[in-house]
């Protein structure tokens, strides 16, 4: 993941190493130019002497080299983090991103008599809202000694090494950390049971297991892209679909080495070249049994908030400290399709989703809830409904219909529970919804 000086020249649009000095020289005032001559292939010592002549010129040179030139290279250089292609871009202002998804509405039966007095009744849309906050505010610190600057102007080759070392010292660290943070998004999502899980045999254990893995992946990709959409493949159980070209497979290097790329491309109904752009190979997942994930391109919610370089001189120590600040929003979209292919021991139920997960109900009103059970064993599992925090008269039926007491004032928690354990050793998987209570004279309907 090392940046070469050719990378530096390409990102800056220059052909010679001394063009960097001239770019800095052109950005400075007359005083700087009076000391530092126009750089050529033959006057490196003269250029170095001019830069080293006094502290003001040195400071101007280092500040421009690190704060401006270095930052341009870091932004433009080839992408080394294999997950970087999923980043959404830059949002420099604010620290919160609001994601809104409006689910489909339910069919109503025509009734001529009801139409007369319900024509102006409001039907609030089933809107899901998620907030993604800035959660990475780090910086990278490096030092440039006076002696390093002096040595840099022995030759243009030394100068190239000097510039490359400055950029690599911070770029490699920032790239590796960003990669690890983005991988962690996958493992955290899996550990919380938010992926839809497809159980498989360990693909590398046999040819048959590898073939079966490809079949299941092909079937899953097909289901994700059906035009009517589905609630089965995202952790909010909203009805949505993906397009085949938007599906990305993330796998580790060991599994990728066993797979036939041409066979995989056919599974996704894509040509080999296009498909390779939708396969991301990583060094491995932290979660045991997690073999691969198939995600929509909109699943990652990663934004750059700030990339900034700052330089300061320490006159007592005869060195410059430079700091590269990286602020980011690192998150994922729970309304986007995301599937995990898992071997080994997999729970029979990985998640229970209650919809709507947020509701506002009038005193004396009702709200229908639905439970979506993410099962990996292909079986139907009994859902037990309960409501907590309510007063006498507030109750929920066995099919998820909540009735709120006319005197209810407390916030309620509706729970849908599936027991995948035994009578002696229960193992509960619980989904929840939060219900706020509105006074009986409040207007509007229930909201999701």
From Swiss-Prot:
This is Major capsid protein. One of its GO terms (cellular component) is T=3 icosahedral viral capsid. Residues 348-425 form the BIG2 domain. Homohexamer. Homopentamer. The prolate capsid is composed of pentamers and hexamers of the capsid protein. It comes from Bacillus phage PZA. InterPro entries: Big_2 (IPR003343). SMART domains: BID_2. It is found in: Virion. Residues 104-127 form a coiled coil. Belongs to the phi29likevirus major capsid protein family. Assembles to form a prolate capsid shell of about 54 nm in length and 45 nm in width, with a T=3, Q=5 symmetry. Signal peptide: none annotated. Its main location: virion. Keywords: Capsid protein, Coiled coil, Late protein, T=3 icosahedral capsid protein, Virion.
């Amino acid at each position: 993941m090392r940046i070469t000086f050719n990378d530096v020249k390409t990102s800056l649009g220059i052909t010679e190493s001394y063009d960097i000095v001239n770019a800095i020289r052109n950005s400075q005032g007359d005083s700087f130019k009076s000391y530092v001559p126009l750089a050529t292939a033959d006057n490196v010592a003269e250029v170095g002497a001019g830069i080293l002549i006094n502290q003001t010129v040195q400071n101007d040179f280092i500040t421009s080299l690190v704060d401006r030139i270095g930052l341009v290279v870091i932004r433009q250089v080839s992408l080394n983090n294999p997950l970087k292609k999923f980043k959404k871009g830059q949002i420099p202002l604010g620290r919160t991103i609001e994601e809104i998804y409006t689910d489909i509405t339910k069919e109503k039966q025509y009734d001529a008599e009801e139409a007369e007095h319900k024509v102006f009744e409001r039907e609030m849309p089933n809107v899901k809202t998620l907030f993604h906050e800035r959660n990475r505010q780090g910086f990278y610190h490096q030092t440039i000694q006076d002696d390093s600057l002096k040595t840099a102007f022995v030759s243009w080759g030394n100068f190239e090494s000097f510039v490359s070392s400055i950029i690599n010292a911070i770029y490699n660290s920032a790239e590796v950390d960003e990669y690890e943070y983005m991988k962690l998004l996958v493992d955290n999502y899996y550990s919380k049971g938010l992926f839809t899980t497809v159980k498989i045999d360990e693909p590398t254990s046999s040819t048959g297991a590898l073939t079966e893995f490809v079949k299941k992946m092909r079937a899953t990709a097909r289901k994700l892209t059906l035009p009517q959409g589905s609630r089965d493949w995202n952790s909010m159980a909203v009805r949505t679909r993906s397009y085949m070209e938007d599906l990305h497979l993330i796998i580790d290097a060991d599994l990728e080495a066993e797979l036939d790329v041409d066979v995989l491309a056919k599974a996704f109904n894509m040509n080999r070249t296009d498909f390779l752009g939708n396969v991301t190979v990583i060094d491995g997942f932290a979660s045991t049994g997690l073999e691969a994930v198939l995600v929509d391109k909109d699943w990652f919610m990663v934004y750059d908030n700030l990339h900034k370089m700052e330089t300061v001189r320490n006159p007592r120590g005869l060195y410059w400290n430079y700091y590269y600040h990286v602020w980011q929003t690192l998150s994922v979209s729970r309304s986007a399709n995301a599937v995990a292919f898992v071997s080994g021991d997999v729970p029979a139920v990985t998640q229970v989703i209650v919809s709507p997960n947020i509701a506002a109900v009038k005193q004396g009103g009702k709200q229908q809830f639905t439970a979506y059970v993410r099962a990996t064993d292909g079986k139907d599992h009994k859902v037990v409904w309960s409501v907590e925090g309510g007063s006498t008269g507030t109750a929920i039926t066995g099919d998820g219909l909540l009735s709120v007491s006319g005197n209810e004032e407390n916030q309620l928690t509706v729970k849908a529970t599936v027991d995948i354990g035994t009578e002696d050793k229960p193992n509960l998987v619980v989904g929840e919804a939060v219900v706020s209570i509105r006074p009986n004279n409040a207007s509007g309907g229930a909201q999701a």
